[in-house]
């Protein structure tokens, strides 16, 4: 992290401020964990609010302070007042205003100082202070460094729990290539603050309702392979969602199952979103297979080398056909 930027932010935070913390739309554990950790760190000296563009999964409601999150979609009037009064806005775990969806306009029009802290590639230039490092395992690891620089003595169990959750989620429990020796060191330091590692694992992974278990079975059964390419993909249709009483977060982690097959380098999940008239796409990979480039080029998306997302405005059948053609072309261009 740039010490000059950190010193400037530290100076701004030396007096009481009205602060908003914003995760990306449909926040995951890293985004929400980062926001909640910073919320706990700042709340005693500042007026702090977390505004999420939309609702987050029930799975993450075990995180300390999650009940304080304001959801813009359902609490617009309250949120608008906070935006009007804000002096500082932190955008966490995203580097393009489009990732904030319905809140992006409020950020761009605000007179508040905007501070970006994020670990994705190719950040947009929208923030007054930009802390960006795509080599970091997670935004939560970056927030640990940020808090430790400002005042490490304030790190308590609540902060540690939120950060540890974000780190283990984004590193696949410390198994993804983004995990470094320093990531493990930060995890160790957080455990020293009383983090209940077993409790977090249980909440993140052993949380299936019976309907979700059946949906997983359907998703696995739907996996297809394209010829002899090292690619698997699967679909969750609107009908699948209705029959399983689908809730936000129910498909979390499903795409990873494709990578457990020997010889497979890329796994893709298509989720039909009829209400939004689009297909949500999750890409995962390993080795040299760069799904962020593929997602950006063909499906208006992006992300990390081994984890990315995208969307399609075509119907599910046409999206599947487009994907098959595109992935063949991509592999021919980049890997032949």
Regions found by a protein language model. Name each.
Residues 3-8, 95-97, 147-150:
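Short, motif-level signal for alpha-helix interfacial/capping segments enriched in acidic residues
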Residues 81-83, 106-109, 123-124, 154-157, ...:
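Solvent-exposed alpha-helices and their adjacent loops that cap or buttress functional pockets
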Residues 38-39, 106-109, 132-133, 185:
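Glycine-rich, phosphate-binding/catalytic loops in enzymes
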Residues 70-129:
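Active-site cofactor/cluster-binding pocket
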